[in-house]
Amino acid sequence: MAWQHKDLLGLRGLAKQEIELILDTAAPMKDIIGRDIKKVPTLRGKSIVCLFYEASTRTRTSFELAGKFMSADTVNIAAASSSVVKGESLIDTGKTLDAMGTDIIVIRHAASGAPHLLAKHVKARVVNAGDGAHEHPTQGLLDLYTIKERKGRLEGLTVTILGDVLHSRVARSNIWGLRTMGAEVRLCGPSTLLPPELAITGVKVFTRIEEALEGADVVNVLRLQLERQKKGLFPTIREYARQFGLNQERLKRCKSDVLVLHPGPMNRGVEIADDVADADFAAIEEQVTNGVAVRMAILYLMMGGSGSGAVH
Amino acid sequence: MKLLDKALLMDGDAIRRAITRIAHEILEKNEGIEQLALVGIRRRGVPLAKRLQEKIQEIEGTTVPLGALDITLYRDDLTTLDVQPVIHKTEVPFSLHGKKVVLVDDVLYTGRTVRAALDALIDIGRPQVIQLAVLIDRGHRELPIRADYVGKNVPTSKREVISVRVMEVDGEDGASIQDMVD
């Protein structure tokens, strides 16, 4: 099967076969990252603009390297140094990029739905690199890829997503992707950081970490978004660490071959203990490598075979 | 577009004999197996390369390294194709440095696949020499590329299609010429 969408805005609504196509395409891409010459000519002459309205190290660099490894021309725009500060609207910025012949716009925005709005107004293909607390589809895909690589499958696994689900776009993309692929999803965190609507999506919700970890195959630890914790949603960081921090002792409740993920950047000693983050059963660095492979796969699938008249 | 069988070019025995002859030619041209390696172009080049490896093993008593090359990422027509090709793994589990590499494919036509394969190989390592072995050369080259070893030369028209079938992929061995019918 071929990629049939103009844009990649979220994992919600993607079919199982579409997710499988991306994951299968990412495997040979990962080989390229491991070579001495990390470059293939696949996207020569194509242009990719990374339009970032929020700070990012790994996602932006990952997209930029993915494009460069495939010989595309990549340009980074940080909103702070663009015409956004002069009051230009998102749609006008998009139209400007369109007029310059941009093939793909990778956008990160603090407002949920911003990539959807942009996609409606530009000819360029749009990839959501994180919108507010909505979705972060490429992070979700790299998490799925990492789990499948380590466990050999996704179907039938129990995955516990631990921490600040309320503010997490990573959690939402994980939930949609994992459920589509047939995994059982558990959410765990302080009740103030668990959005009630997620309980109706078919996931199990826990407020006691011990119960959430019981027999889990995978634990995906979310970053405690300290910059968003001024609303008093939990008393102190110390108390959070004591109640919900993942440590070796708590991990004993999981399956013996448990896999630990973290989208980074980590608050060591808060949501995850040092000796957990650096253990062999954690794949945190591997997630970063896999992120480049998955993004290469997405760029390939979005740009290859455009003669098919791909649709929204 | 339909394809109608026109003639059988090679049966299983003919393919086996062609592989045997090419194996001898490879050994003769390279004066043995020192630094020799075989790399098949996916898909049908890979089983043909494997058969060449087995034949060389039979003749020389030594196994030469075998790799598989996927050239999808090196094609120059990706964004104009209607159907997106699926990418498979490239597996070259040995160093190409200093090797005499024999690239193996089923059909040589425009030469674009071989050009892509040459680019792909050179990105993986720096062989001493690259040679080309094909089961069928049907002509119509669009690039200055020539095979070193050919199982069978078949002059064709552009409205004809050469179909090579191998046991490992298609469940039978054979090569036939087909007509494109609108």
UniProtKB/Swiss-Prot annotation, chain A:
The keyword Transferase applies. SUPFAM superfamilies: Aspartate/ornithine carbamoyltransferase. GO terms for cellular component: cytosol. InterPro entries: Asp/Orn_carbamoyltranf_P-bd, Asp/Orn_carbamoylTrfase, Asp/Orn_carbamoylTrfase_sf, Asp_carbamoyltransf, Asp_carbamoyltransf_Asp/Orn-bd. Pathway: Pyrimidine metabolism; UMP biosynthesis via de novo pathway; (S)-dihydroorotate from bicarbonate: step 2/3. Keywords: Pyrimidine biosynthesis, Transferase. It catalyses: carbamoyl phosphate + L-aspartate = N-carbamoyl-L-aspartate + phosphate + H(+). It holds the Pfam family OTCace. GO terms for biological process: 'de novo' pyrimidine nucleobase biosynthetic process; 'de novo' UMP biosynthetic process; amino acid metabolic process. Its EC number is 2.1.3.2. It is an enzyme of class 2 (transferase). The keyword Electron transport does not apply. Carbamoyl phosphate binds at R58, T59, R108, H136, Q139, G264, P265. One of its GO terms (molecular function) is aspartate carbamoyltransferase activity. Heterododecamer (2C3:3R2) of six catalytic PyrB chains organized as two trimers (C3), and six regulatory PyrI chains organized as three dimers (R2). Catalyzes the condensation of carbamoyl phosphate and aspartate to form carbamoyl aspartate and inorganic phosphate, the committed step in the de novo pyrimidine nucleotide biosynthesis pathway. Belongs to the aspartate/ornithine carbamoyltransferase superfamily. ATCase family. This is Aspartate carbamoyltransferase catalytic subunit. It comes from Heliobacterium modesticaldum (strain ATCC 51547 / Ice1).
